[in-house]
């Protein structure tokens, strides 16, 4: 590894391993070098993981961080990504420190780019499963790019990050919190809506500190679900008949800006994944009227 890349600094410990800012020696290009943590490094990497990760090299879109190379030696796997300095978490923290709110134009542009990246991957049957502000990168022109798409299925999502930090629950959809084992692209749509809400509110929408706290925070806003609202939910492994019953809150009282934005995220936060708006349908929502589609 050291022959090809000079590690400049450690920039993070993500869900899947350590990330370094590095320089490619023969081109001088600055890249993000992600060392994938493997459950048992002695056994080597399963062929399925290698296949899945190689598929990610085919994802080429302006809204997705490009995976330019996969390096595998001594049972270690490194992924070489284009380097983008800022992520949405740090972008929002910086705005907050400066006492500034995010402009409406940024919210619309970011939401459209986020849904475009999702639609591009979902149409190829690749899901993210771990969308959060930390893996949405913001370039100097305030365009966003999604990182870590597809790694969830390729590497498996651990319960803890590389250190012992627990993977955040704030963007996790209710079907996963309720123990549903089968899920699809709609999990990403829920996470995206939570992120869009956070950008507008300048604070996490559902900042739970445990799975039950996470569920109850969702229920307090959207109402406690039951079979009449979400078919079969009462049979999910973690559903309890003793759940407190909350009525839904009108989202317009939380988001006082553009009513089209409220309509869009309410459709993305539909409890029943089958009824939840898809990324593709989201892109043709009235909220994006007049905005040109983003081509590859």
From Swiss-Prot:
Q: Where in the cell is it found?
A: Nucleus
* GO cellular component terms, semicolon-separated: cyclin-dependent protein kinase holoenzyme complex; cytoplasm; nucleus
InterPro entries xrefs: CDK, Kinase-like_dom_sf, Prot_kinase_dom, Protein_kinase_ATP_BS, Ser/Thr_kinase_AS
Quick check: keyword DNA-binding in the entry? no
* Record Pfam families: Pkinase
Q: Which reaction is this enzyme known to catalyze?
A: L-seryl-[protein] + ATP = O-phospho-L-seryl-[protein] + ADP + H(+); L-threonyl-[protein] + ATP = O-phospho-L-threonyl-[protein] + ADP + H(+)
**One GO molecular-function annotation for this sequence?**
cyclin binding
The Protein kinase domain, residue ranges = 5-288
Q: Which residues bind ATP?
A: 11-19, 34
CDD domains, per the entry? STKc_CDK_like
Which SUPFAM superfamilies has this protein been placed in?
Protein kinase-like (PK-like)
Answer whether the UniProt record assigns the keyword Transmembrane helix to this protein: no
Major enzyme class: transferase
Entry EC number(s): 2.7.11.22
Give the residue range of the signal peptide. none
Show the SMART domains listed in the entry. Answer: S_TKc
According to its UniProt entry, the function of this protein is described as: Cyclin-dependent kinase that acts as a master regulator of the mitotic and meiotic cell cycles.
Q: Which PANTHER family match?
A: CELL DIVISION PROTEIN KINASE (PTHR24056), CYCLIN-DEPENDENT KINASE 2 (PTHR24056:SF254)
For this chain, the family text in UniProt reads:
Belongs to the protein kinase superfamily. CMGC Ser/Thr protein kinase family. CDC2/CDKX subfamily.
Protein's recorded name: Cyclin-dependent kinase 1
Query: From which organism does this entry originate?
Result: Encephalitozoon cuniculi (strain GB-M1)
């Amino acid at each position: 590894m050291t022959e090809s890349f000079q590690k400049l600094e450690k920039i993070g410990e993500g869900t899947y391993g350590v990330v370094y800012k590095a320089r490619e020696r023969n081109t001088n290009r600055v890249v993000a070098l992600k060392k994938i943590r493997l459950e048992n490094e002695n056994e080597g990497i399963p062929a399925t993981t290698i296949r899945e990760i190689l598929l990610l090299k085919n994802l080429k879109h302006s809204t997705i961080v490009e995976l330019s190379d996969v390096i595998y030696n001594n049972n270690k796997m490194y992924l070489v990504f284009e380097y983008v300095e800022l992520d949405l978490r740090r972008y929002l923290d910086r705005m907050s420190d400066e006492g500034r709110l995010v402009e409406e134009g940024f919210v619309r542009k970011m939401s459209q780019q986020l849904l475009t990246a999702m639609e591009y991957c979902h149409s190829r049957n690749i899901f993210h499963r771990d969308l959060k502000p930390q893996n949405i990168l913001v370039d100097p022109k305030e365009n966003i790019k999604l990182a870590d798409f597809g790694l969830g299925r390729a590497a498996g999502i651990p319960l803890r990050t590389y250190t012992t930090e627990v993977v955040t629950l704030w963007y996790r959809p209710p079907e996963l919190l309720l123990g549903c084992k089968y899920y699809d692209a709609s999990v990403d749509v829920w996470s995206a809506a939570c992120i869009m809400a956070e950008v507008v509110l300048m604070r996490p929408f559902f900042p739970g500190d445990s799975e039950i706290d996470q569920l109850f925070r969702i229920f307090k806003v959207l109402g406690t679900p039951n079979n009449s609202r979400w078919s079969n939910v009462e049979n999910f492994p973690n559903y309890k008949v003793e759940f407190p019953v909350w009525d839904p809150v009108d989202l317009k009282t939380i988001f006082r800006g553009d009513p089209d934005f409220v309509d869009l995220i309410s459709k993305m936060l539909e409890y029943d994944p089958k009824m939840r708006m898809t990324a593709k349908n989201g892109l043709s929502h009235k909220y994006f009227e007049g905005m040109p589609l983003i081509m590859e």
